[in-house]
Amino acid sequence: MLKKILLLALLPAIAFAEELPAPVKAIEKQGITIIKTFDAPGGMKGYLGKYQDMGVTIYLTPDGKHAISGYMYNEKGENLSNTLIEKEIYAPAGREMWQRMEQSHWLLDGKKDAPVIVYVFADPFCPYCKQFWQQARPWVDSGKVQLRTLLVGVIKPESPATAAAILASKDPAKTWQQYEASGGKLKLNVPANVSTEQMKVLSDNEKLMDDLGANVTPAIYYMSKENTLQQAVGLPDQKTLNIIMGNK
């Protein structure tokens, strides 16, 4: 699951337009940012907000004199508040991050019309990235999954130049596939100095990776069947791998 703290940080700081009832305003003063209202069960009015690294819900009693901050459960034991927070805060922010990855500089591995899309941030010197690349072969080669790799240079001092060599090649996507297939032994024309163009690509990818809350590679992102952004950092186990590749 994607780190919630990060997605909350992506939300725009928009001032709530309505005048808040006194009990809600008192809670707001504790550092909560009110985002929107919603209709709550039992004749109560709900307020959706964020506090530090958490989404929060506040419930105003029908008389308007009391407010309760916390989770609301129904008779089945279902957390109604958490469902709302996921839908209204985390899911939209996750889709925004997905769009940012779509618009980034990635290398295609697989068929461009493969139904399952998986983004992976990878460093040329990352051994787990190479293992993940090998793990993904059955799904990629069968046309079920397309990997979209965003190269970064974070593991070794030589990482940026090596990544730049791949990006500067005639066919970067093909070169990356050959490089991973060779276990990193493919001979590259590594530049003494990384060009401004290639450095910008690497810097942009690293910034995006950081914004997503990942600090190791491979950092893997995919959408769940509920259309929410999911994260797997490091080499996934078999169960997680199946989920990533669409074998829900």
UniProtKB/Swiss-Prot annotation:
| Annotated GO MF terms | protein disulfide isomerase activity; protein homodimerization activity
Query: Where is it mainly found?
Result: periplasm
A Pfam family that the UniProt record links to this protein: DsbC_N
What results from gene inactivation? No visible phenotype.
Q: Which InterPro entries does the record cross-reference, listed alphabetically? A: DiS-bond_Isoase_DsbC/G (IPR033954), DiS-bond_isomerase_DsbC/G_N (IPR018950), DiS-bond_isomerase_DsbC/G_N_sf (IPR009094), Thiol:disulfide_interchange (IPR051470), Thioredoxin-like_fold (IPR012336), Thioredoxin-like_sf (IPR036249)
Q: Which domain of life is it from?
A: Bacteria
Q: Using the record, list the residue span of the signal peptide; answer none if the entry has no such feature.
A: 1-17
What is one term from the GO cellular component aspect held by the record?
A: outer membrane-bounded periplasmic space
Q: What are the recorded Gene Ontology BP terms?
A: chaperone-mediated protein folding
Q: Which CDD domains match?
A: DsbA_DsbC_DsbG
Compartments annotated for it: namely: Periplasm
Q: Which UniProt keywords apply?
A: Chaperone, Disulfide bond, Periplasm, Redox-active center, Signal
What S-S linkages are listed for this chain?
Answer: C126-C129
This protein's assembly is summarised as: Homodimer. Interacts with ErfK, YbiS and YnhG.
What's its job?
A: Involved in disulfide bond formation. DsbG and DsbC are part of a periplasmic reducing system that controls the level of cysteine sulfenylation, and provides reducing equivalents to rescue oxidatively damaged secreted proteins such as ErfK, YbiS and YnhG. Probably also functions as a disulfide isomerase with a narrower substrate specificity than DsbC. DsbG is maintained in a reduced state by DsbD. Displays chaperone activity in both redox states in vitro.
Family as reported in the entry's similarity comment: Belongs to the thioredoxin family. DsbC subfamily.
Name of the protein this chain belongs to: Thiol:disulfide interchange protein DsbG
Source organism of the structure: Escherichia coli (strain K12)
